[in-house]
């Protein structure tokens, strides 16, 4: 399925109330993620993997300079992408699946994990969020979280972080573990 220049792959459950997970993908790894999760759980769910994203533009909440030498600046267009996601992409997905999801969750890795949490402050459509190695080092994100409220308190938040992320020499990115822990404490 292709909508608004995004590539969308739907993995549909046969259950009429299976939750729907929306996964923003870095490199169209949706099928790999879906198969991995299916192999680890008996929980029935549908998943829509969304690819062909302008990662540094659409996953970032506000403009910020690049953190890698020679890297692309962050454009801060998350609100625009969220409008596209909730106004066009999600309705198209819901029209294509037969289930009426029990709940919907937003998931992502890296900047996609940052976006998953940020989106909870901008829309009440999602009941849960998954942030795998979320880019919580992003400038001013902790301040944003502390100064704003969720549109709808999520039933669940899941954070994970690998062993290597905080060991980078990059002074901005190396704060990711400390900031992830701080967010965890804030949400308790």
Question: Which residues make up each language-model segment?
Answer:
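Serine-hydrolase catalytic machinery in alpha/beta-hydrolase-like enzymes
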Residues: 6, 14-96
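A conserved amphipathic alpha-helix that caps or lines the catalytic cleft of carbohydrate-
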Residues: 37-38, 120, 184
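Conserved hydrolase catalytic core segment
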Residues: 118-128
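Short beta-strand immediately N-terminal to the catalytic nucleophile in serine-hydrolase-like folds
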Residues: 103-108, 132
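Loop/turn elements at helix/coil->beta-strand transitions in domains of secreted/extracellular proteins
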Residues: 16-20, 43-46, 102, 125-127, ...
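The feature captures the conserved acid-bearing segment of alpha/beta-hydrolase catalytic domains
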Residues: 136-188
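Alpha/beta-hydrolase
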Residues: 23-24, 132, 161
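Gly/Ala-rich beta-loop-alpha elbow adjacent to hydrolase catalytic centers
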Residues: 107-112, 116
